């Protein structure tokens, strides 16, 4: 981009000034907060096995400790991907925490069970409440660790129920991670 801009005659100072104002895309490897231990917490929309693997791969080179991943799978959606999501997290994360992510009209426990079925013999932490799962990840993250909260990204609600009973409960992974980091002793 820089070379192309300069080759069109745009002054270098103008190009560099524009670059300083670039903003990251909300919910795509968005750095939410640093834990008190100094571990960065990232939020990403990764809600498929390939996207989860890509997000983990993008962060892995920057981890000197553990890569802690919080994730789930949406209800009333592609049920076949759930075991694959579990397999990816179990194989590629150092600590995987399975939680709820827009269960909609499905039983959240059954969604988590389908994810866990793909984890093999790997030890996985299951925490139903998304806020509690994020709090656990933030709490256990130490120096050199990175936390990835995957699945919701830019979304600002947790979808539960279906039809007339459907509700969207306020929930923002970035805000929750910041709150959890602020509540740490």
Which residues are covered by each model-predicted region?
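ATP-dependent carboxylate-amine ligase
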Residues: 3-185
